[in-house]
Amino acid sequence: MIERLNIVKQRFDEVNDLIIQPDVISDQKRYIELNKEYKDLRALMDEREKYISITDNIQEAEEIISDGSDPEMTEMAKLQLDEAKGQLPALEDKIRMMLIPKDPEDGKNIVMEIRAGTGGDEASIFAGDLYRMYTKYVEGRGWSHNIVDFSEGTSGGFKEMIFEVSGDDVYGTMKFEAGVHRVQRVPQTETQGRVHTSAATVMVLPEAEEFDVEIDPKEVRIDYFCSSGPGGQSVNTTYSAVRLTHEPTGLVAQCQDQKSQHKNKEKAFRVLRSRLYEMELAKKMEADAAKRNSMVSSGDRSAKIRTYNYAQSRVTDHRINLTLYDLSNIINGDIQKIIDELQLAENTEKLKENSDTI
């Protein structure tokens, strides 16, 4: 393991030198990429120092025990050896996980889309529940979020909700939420007390930078219309809302959340760029998942990933057969335990895949 860590140390020193070079600082794309790499390598260097300290302690203790000339020192060395050997396995496991090649998308911000599926009004209400669950989780993480576009349901909730989330490692955390979520409960409108099953689809798009996707302005049709969103009468009487249509792919992105037409256009372009980027990413994820037979990150938007059963207070994630009887806390934003298990499952898959090199 130390050989692998020493190779990483060489790269860390190289990156440390590169990020202060004028030609790198002037190249925005390269500078951002190297800064992200520096942050990851810095964390590994901290663990490398711990690893060297523990292995040095083991070697020192073994030498004292082997010498045996001082009984008191030998006893102290035995205690030191036991303590150091006890610390080593957990640290080695942590380092192995950190040595897994990181998905370059994981550090990106996201555009998140929630759409009501089968189930009529109840599906819209459930989509609203999911939006509230995610925003509470996002706020708890100290991330920021803002609405891009939405369409309200006739009896509450949303037929569609599109919002941006910004922070550290947002995509790497939230990407596991993409797929079909099902709810099993008695709707408020149900008089016979029958349980209905409804669904909502969640999409998580890594927010593409301008240098990730180049959009030819000639290929984008721009339409302006009156906003139906919040913001008072002035919003509804001016053509501030913006709809973009990317003609080669047919992809559409619109924003009506801001009073400013310019800001709405800017947001809509971010969403369009992210959707184009995600199209390519989904193909790559599908190919990668097929290669390692992964169910955690398959890139399949139609996959049923999770069921929320209100009668049993049960939440089941079907990808990893995880069942938790804690629905009220989960639907109120406490989804970290689910995300932790999904990240662990994906890292375990990657660890098997990279076992020869780590």
UniProtKB/Swiss-Prot annotation:
Protein name per its UniProtKB record: Peptide chain release factor 1
UniProtKB keywords: Cytoplasm, Methylation, Protein biosynthesis
Record's subcellular location: Cytoplasm
TM ranges: none
Residues with N5-methylglutamine modification: Q233
Entries under NCBIfam families matching the protein: prfA, PRK00591.1
Keyword Protein biosynthesis found: yes
Pfam family, any one: PCRF
Organism: Christiangramia forsetii (strain DSM 17595 / CGMCC 1.15422 / KT0803) (Gramella forsetii)
Cited InterPro entries: PCRF (IPR005139), Pep_chain_release_fac_I (IPR000352), Pep_chain_release_fac_I_sf (IPR045853), Prokaryotic/Mito_RF (IPR050057), RF-1 (IPR004373)
SUPFAM superfamilies: Release factor (SSF75620)
Family under the similarity heading: Belongs to the prokaryotic/mitochondrial release factor family.
Modification(s) after translation: Methylated by PrmC. Methylation increases the termination efficiency of RF1.
GO cellular component, one term: cytoplasm
Function of the molecule: Peptide chain release factor 1 directs the termination of translation in response to the peptide chain termination codons UAG and UAA.
